Amino acid sequence: MRIADYSVTKAVLDRHGFTFKKSFGQNFLTDTNILQKIVDTAEIDQNVNVIEIGPGIGALTEFLAENAAEVMAFEIDDRLVPILADTLRDFDNVQVVNQDILKADLQTQIKQFKNPDLPIKVVANLPYYITTPILMHLIESKIPFQEFVVMMQREVADRISAEPNTKAYGSLSIAVQYYMTAKVAFIVPRTVFVPAPNVDSAILKMMRRDQPLIEVKDEDFFFRVSRLSFVHRRKTLWNNLTSHFGKSEDIKAKLEKGLALADIKSSIRGEALSIQDFGKLADALKEVGL
């Protein structure tokens, strides 16, 4: 019997008197086929260390520990730590860290792996309410994560992996795809969780690029330009740019010059621009003094 078997999950929760906290976005997976599929998608083997975020009662951790060299699982809910000690007692390659992943000193933590030189993959069932902050925190960190295989709300996975000229495409797509390739691996129905969430989930597979997708003069400015271009999705690029930078004659002249330099029409919307287009636009606007 697996931890994820519904009867085992229920017995563990009952034995420990555990009640779900909405503030932690807790939904425990009870489908062993999907758990195996996650491990297969992540291509976990004995030559890989895994960082897991939000192990819950250890359903996914069990599968990871059977395949990986070592698993370091970050759990913010201290009520789950003794439960994990119980459910994972047969594994000597699992470290449970009772800490918020956003506050963890990951540079120090990864040195605690028995073999810290192995490639590191992140595998997680992320709480819906904090998916984006966790992802961007990890992606922008200097930790050498090779790959992310992460379960999240389907809508967010679609936004991250979206292409230009689609409804889902936006600044989040650009922020992630600048650093990573991103592809939805498969959909996870809401019915396989306890308690069941209101929406379906998706497994998103992301691979870190050797170099960012494009080279830009100023990364912060590039991300700022991409964000402001989607503030009002139905407005033109020109309207979003002037709303942010201002509408004085001097500013408008600089914007016109920057758009001309980048060879981008002011009348299009942000969703029509590729990441490469945004790179050219940001560099051009920087060049004209914005």
From Swiss-Prot:
Recorded hits in InterPro entries, A to Z, give: KsgA/Erm, rRNA_Ade_diMease-like_C, rRNA_Ade_Mease_Trfase_CS, rRNA_Ade_methylase_Trfase_N, rRNA_adenine_dimethylase, SAM-dependent_MTases_sf
* Short name of any one Pfam family annotated for the protein: RrnaAD
Q: Name one GO cellular component term.
A: cytosol
User: What class does this enzyme belong to in the EC scheme?
Assistant: transferase
> What EC number(s) has UniProt assigned to this enzyme?
2.1.1.182
Chief localisation class: cytoplasm
Question: Per its record, what are the GO molecular function terms?
Answer: 16S rRNA (adenine(1518)-N(6)/adenine(1519)-N(6))-dimethyltransferase activity; RNA binding
Q: Where in the cell is it found?
A: Cytoplasm
Q: Which Gene3D superfamilies does this one have?
A: Ribosomal RNA adenine dimethylase-like, domain 2, Vaccinia Virus protein VP39
Reaction equations catalysed: adenosine(1518)/adenosine(1519) in 16S rRNA + 4 S-adenosyl-L-methionine = N(6)-dimethyladenosine(1518)/N(6)-dimethyladenosine(1519) in 16S rRNA + 4 S-adenosyl-L-homocysteine + 4 H(+)
The protein's UniProt keywords, in alphabetical order, are:
Cytoplasm, Methyltransferase, RNA-binding, rRNA processing, S-adenosyl-L-methionine, Transferase
Binding site residues for S-adenosyl-L-methionine: 27, 29, 54, 75, 100, 125
Give the PANTHER family listed for this entry: DIMETHYLADENOSINE TRANSFERASE, DIMETHYLADENOSINE TRANSFERASE-RELATED
Family from the record: Belongs to the class I-like SAM-binding methyltransferase superfamily. rRNA adenine N(6)-methyltransferase family. RsmA subfamily.
The protein's matches in NCBIfam families, at most eight in alphabetical order, are given as: ksgA
What's the stated role of this polypeptide? Answer: Specifically dimethylates two adjacent adenosines (A1518 and A1519) in the loop of a conserved hairpin near the 3'-end of 16S rRNA in the 30S particle. May play a critical role in biogenesis of 30S subunits.
Protein name stated in the entry = Ribosomal RNA small subunit methyltransferase A
> What organism, scientifically named, is this protein from?
Streptococcus pyogenes serotype M3 (strain ATCC BAA-595 / MGAS315)
